[in-house]
Amino acid sequence: MKKMPMRKRFGQHFLHDSFVLQKIVSAIHPQKTDTLVEIGPGRGALTDYLLTECDNLALVEIDGDLVAFLQKKYNQQKNITIYQNDALQFDFSSVKTDKPLRVVGNLPYNISTPLLFHLFSQIHCIEDMHFMLQKEVVRRITAEVGSHDYGRLSVMAQYFCDNTYLFTVSPQAFTPPPRVESAIIRLIPRHNFTPVAKNLDQLSHVVKEAFSYRRKTVGNALKKLINPSQWPLLEINPQLRPQELTVEDFVKISNILN
């Protein structure tokens, strides 16, 4: 079958290492009754492995040439549905299933963060997620409070999910090799986070505002939102830096604004 060209505008790096592919499938541990959604399947390297383990697989691919390639490759498969769609705009609840979705994929580096935020907005229909991401992004998602990597993505990802850094993947596992290392992460939605954010848009705004001034104290960084008299009510020291606040702290700040 004719090979498809890589398109830089889609951030395409195709995974080809069979050992890494098997390791990813083992981490996902798909079951026959699962409904899996693969974002950015490319030429179907991971798809081939998933098809043998799962009876209901949906592929979301933006590249029209790759969609045609995949339709031809899997035209005899009854357990696969291909959506030509931008994952950043895709309604994941539109996938026909009576079970929560298990979302997987080798996410394009150039859209990984906005795509994660899009998925968080649809977390109600997702059971878990396993992604290949730039290693730096995985470190930010799983960063601990007070660390250099802890920031906006850390707070929002940790509000919505329990996140586990699984393993690192070398650039040599891809064609063409990216300039940076990649890593596999598991994200499991949290449905009982305490305290609950009353307004998720407000929470996102507070976190974004705070980390726009991460070198300032949180009292100064959020002075447009929080007046000095409110900090004692929150039981948060306004002299702390934004990266020293926990997810719970940010939720409390957000909730006092509602």
Curated annotation (Swiss-Prot):
Molecular function (GO) terms listed? 16S rRNA (adenine(1518)-N(6)/adenine(1519)-N(6))-dimethyltransferase activity; RNA binding
Q: Which SUPFAM superfamilies does the protein's record reference?
A: S-adenosyl-L-methionine-dependent methyltransferases
Q: Name the UniProt key words of this record, in alphabetical order.
A: Cytoplasm, Methyltransferase, RNA-binding, rRNA processing, S-adenosyl-L-methionine, Transferase
Q: Does the keyword Methyltransferase apply?
A: yes
Primary location recorded for the protein, binned into one broad class: cytoplasm
Q: Which reaction does it catalyse?
A: adenosine(1518)/adenosine(1519) in 16S rRNA + 4 S-adenosyl-L-methionine = N(6)-dimethyladenosine(1518)/N(6)-dimethyladenosine(1519) in 16S rRNA + 4 S-adenosyl-L-homocysteine + 4 H(+)
Binding of S-adenosyl-L-methionine occurs at 13, 15, 40, 61, 86, 106
Any one GO cellular component localisation term in the record: cytosol
Location(s), subcellular: Cytoplasm
Q: What Pfam families has UniProt attached to this entry? A: RrnaAD
List, alphabetically, the HAMAP family matched.
16SrRNA_methyltr_A (MF_00607)
Q: What does this protein do?
A: Specifically dimethylates two adjacent adenosines (A1518 and A1519) in the loop of a conserved hairpin near the 3'-end of 16S rRNA in the 30S particle. May play a critical role in biogenesis of 30S subunits.
Protein name, entry field: Ribosomal RNA small subunit methyltransferase A
Q: What organism does this protein naturally occur in?
A: Coxiella burnetii (strain Dugway 5J108-111)
Provide the organism lineage as a comma list: Bacteria, Pseudomonadati, Pseudomonadota, Gammaproteobacteria, Legionellales
Q: Which gene encodes it?
A: rsmA
